[in-house]
Amino acid sequence: MPTLKFSHSILEYMQNKNGIKYNSEEWVEKMPSIGCVVEENDNEGIEIEIFPDRTDLLSHETIARAARSFLNSVEYSPDFEVSEGNIDMTVDPTIEKIRPVILGAVVRGVDNGNSSKEKDDFIQSLMEHQEKLHLTLGRKRKFASIGVHDLSKLKPPFNVISVDKNHSFIPLAEGKEMSIKEILKSHPKGKEYAHVMENMNKYPV
């Protein structure tokens, strides 16, 4: 079961935005009833062990929403408008055996805060949520992986193709191009997940 550390300041911000007063002691006492066992509650945050069947509670946003519903009887009915987009993503047939299912979506109207700190906290929380989904539902990216990108910095249409190990690009947090072979040997994330692609001779990009 994953154990996560949630920041008091982020949880307080989220609850205040929804008219709820955040009380970490109340969480310690009552949240175990919905599969959230509190391991530690210190000055910085609250550490919670999430039950395996509650993968919907792996982020600040989702656990704060669950607490509003459970502790404060706030009704929540998601109302998302979903429509067909006009951005094309072409998947090369050679990808079928590597990644048989590929999905994409554009999410708009997300409130990521006003101040620089709020925006930074939002991005950090989003990345942590992504990694926890990789670890749990994605089985360390063996079954599934997620990519989150800033659409304003990308130019559609998008093409998903397969390449060999000599293909080069600039990986995350690097300032120079690296080949896939180099990434799998020396980049932190590449080394961490190299085992997922150890039997591949083609790689999806």
What spans do the regions from the language model cover?
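RNA/tRNA-interacting regions in translation and RNA-turnover enzymes
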Residues: 1-205
